[in-house]
Amino acid sequence: MLNTYTNSSTKIQGRLSVWLANHKLPHRPLGFDYQGVEILQIRSEDWLSIAVALYVYGFNYLRSQCAYDVAPGGLLASVYHFTKIEDNVDQPEEICIKIFVSRQKPKIPSVFWIWKSADFQERESYDMLGISYENHPRLKRILMPDTWIGWPLRKDYIVPDFYELQDAY
């Protein structure tokens, strides 16, 4: 379970983490990346309400969304990078959100209805890793053929009928 301020002396919390805690929104601070961008972990079931709160807070631009396989047989992660775009600001505020889900039933609420730019990005994560983004209007394969079996970027994926190509010369 994610608790906000349990043992807060061991975690450095950024401005957004403090704001979320003040509004009693569940999250876990994961520190900062090398550029000083705050990273937060959010549970899948809390994601939609937190996403709306982020938009209200001012994060009006979804810069990127990607997903990765944490470990063979382990969790899958969906990562969102948001930016707060404002006039006359040299250094816009940024945030990174990570959502970890089970590979057996990987479901995360879609944020398409908040940030339209999530459309193709969530579809790519679905196509490559099998993460289902609930309430996405067009969640279907975007890179692989509709007949493709499995999720090619999972670490435990085995290519069907794979054979090694030899050098032609």
UniProtKB/Swiss-Prot annotation:
SUPFAM superfamilies: Nqo5-like. Gene3D superfamilies: NADH:ubiquinone oxidoreductase, 30kDa subunit. Its EC number is 7.1.1.-. It is a peripheral membrane protein. GO terms for biological process: photosynthesis, light reaction. Keywords: Chloroplast, Membrane, NAD, NADP, Plastid, Plastoquinone, Quinone, Thylakoid, Translocase, Transport. It is found in: Plastid, Chloroplast thylakoid membrane. GO terms for molecular function: NADH dehydrogenase (ubiquinone) activity; quinone binding. One of its GO terms (cellular component) is chloroplast thylakoid membrane. It catalyses: a plastoquinone + NADH + (n+1) H(+)(in) = a plastoquinol + NAD(+) + n H(+)(out); a plastoquinone + NADPH + (n+1) H(+)(in) = a plastoquinol + NADP(+) + n H(+)(out). Belongs to the complex I 30 kDa subunit family. NDH is composed of at least 16 different subunits, 5 of which are encoded in the nucleus. NDH shuttles electrons from NAD(P)H:plastoquinone, via FMN and iron-sulfur (Fe-S) centers, to quinones in the photosynthetic chain and possibly in a chloroplast respiratory chain. The immediate electron acceptor for the enzyme in this species is believed to be plastoquinone. Couples the redox reaction to proton translocation, and thus conserves the redox energy in a proton gradient. This is NAD(P)H-quinone oxidoreductase subunit J, chloroplastic. It comes from Physcomitrium patens.
